[in-house]
Every structure is written in structure tokens, then in C-alpha cells.
Amino acid sequence: MQAGGEITVYKMTGKDLKAYMEWSAGYFNSVKEGDVTYSFNLDRRSSKYSTNDFFAGVTYTIDLTKPAGSRITDLHFADGKPITDTTPIRIGMNSYRMGHLTKVGGVLEGRSFPVLFDTEEEFGEDEGTIRNLTIRYLSEVKNGKYEGKPMNRWALSGLEGYEKEREIIKNLINSGEISVPKSSDGRYTNVASINVKDKMFQNEEELAVYLSQLEKEF
């Protein structure tokens, strides 16, 4: 959703939803044997527009051992009911985002979806924006107080094996001793996975040299 616009509810099928979700999951790079970190596709990471969408009301796993377009698994409604290609879906998003999805070249190009509800029509052009509806909810329903909590709606899978090496790399990243690879211009981070297959680093300096060489590829 975009912060400044409205929320429109559209009717689609489970097949449409999964196509949309697969497109979003393409934001991640595929996992290769020896990878100990997940990473992002450089073209998507550096795009002018946000293309990393997440989904509420459902639970799912993104299996990064599979190629882009075939990664969404275990797709269910929040109540545990499985979602199939023919399952009726009501999905809420900003109309600007829907336009991006259905335009020429978009993942849902050529498809049209009936509008079931539009917050601008219901509440007005100003009061029907996501921003003002959120303000109204927080002030009128939550009395100005909101405590966030993890929703645990989705998960990544694919990093298997190399547990010892992964733990070492994780600790080095979290301590700030090393960083994940970034693009050559330094603007975009985590554009490649750290891979330890057939690599033995005698010290942190050797690891730093490897990471520097990896960044030069981007």
C-alpha cells in the first residue's frame, strides 16, 4: 500500500493472487549451495519503485531454492484454510499499485478486477486516504496507543547446511565486523549472498578480501 492514497478492495482468484505474490518474491535472489545469507535481486533492489510487497490475511513460505515464479508454497488464509487457483479472493491495495500491476509489462497485464469497495468513495477524497484512516483508527479505536507485535505471516526457506559457517557469518555481521555485499556504487546493500562453499578463511582479513571481490561483481 502507498501511504498517501486510498484503499480499494478488488475481487480476484487465488491464481491471480499467487501470480502477484510470485512477482513480489522475485525480489530475492535464488539460493545456491553454500550460501549462508539471503540477498536481493540488484535490478529490483535498485528500482525507482518499491517492488517488494508483503501480504496480510494469509500465511506463506518463499522457497528460494526454486526459480523465480515458482517460490510461493504453503499458501493459506490466516485461519489455516488452503488457497487454490479457484479460491475467491478480496484484496485491498492502493489503486496506483494495481495500475502498476496491470499495466503493459506488469505481472497482471491485461487482467481486470471488479472493485468491491473504495475508501475515497466511502469516506471522501481526504478522509479516505490510508494516512487519515490510520490516524482515525489510532485515535478513535486505540485511544492513541498501539503496541506492535510480530505477525509471523511469512517465512523464507532455502538456507540448509553450513550451519556452523552461517552462525559465524551472522555474528560477524551483527557485530559490525563485516557487512553484506553492496552494489558497486555503494547505494544498494545485500545484493549478493555470502557463499562459503569450498572456502576456508584462516582469519577475518581473508574473509574481508573475499567480500570485497564479491562486491566488484556488482
Feature map (PLM): residue ranges:
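Catalytic centers of hydrolytic enzymes
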Residues: 1-218
